[in-house]
Amino acid sequence: MESLVNKNIILGVTGGIAAYKSAEIVRHLKKSGSSVRVVMTASAEEFITPLTMQALSGNRVSTELLDVEAEAAMGHIELAKWADGILIAPATANTLARLSSGRGDDLLSTVTLAFNGPIALAPAMNQAMWRDSRTQGNLDSLIGNGFTICGPDSGEQACGDVGLGRMLEPIQILDIFSSLFDKGILLGKDVLITAGPTQEPIDPVRFITNRSSGKMGYNSVSYTHLRAHET
């Protein structure tokens, strides 16, 4: 993750059970040579304390949009100008909906609106919420607006369900996020990606197919759209 050296990174933490993994993300970012400032939503504070994130990042944690002290210097604009990149992990279904609609009703969403640079989201939610057509519509909108989606993973969830919706492990998220600062050979290239199952006819009646979920193609789109001229 050499591309993160000397980068100013905002880590957004929202209110999901996976918020505890955000502490490890801060640790990895610092180890990679990044300066980290953490922005937490009110619900995130129910899962992990600002004091923990402050101790790990070495910087004051921002939580309030209407913070009198911070807004004396237009805090949300100052944060947006300071950052080289924004990573929101975990990104709940509510967060995806808020960002997709362009709402700016808390500090994190307002900073995101004011920021002009790479933004990555690491979704974390129940598998039914992930499959919901409205969530998928929000994801399509976010990808269309230049957001990078990291994951999610499939497996057992905190509620006991099994399926897509688990947040990727911190190191997996950071592998994707760091690549946003290293455009490499795809810069200026047009990329075509296919996803999902295919069918190859054997005869007019029968065909060979596979059980592809499209997950690999979906993640490939997230990986390439900021590195290519058109994906």
Regions found by a protein language model. Give the residues of each.
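Glycine-rich phosphate/pyrophosphate-binding loop and the adjoining helix
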Residues: 154-191
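Glycine/threonine-rich flexible loop motifs
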Residues: 94-104, 129-132, 202-209
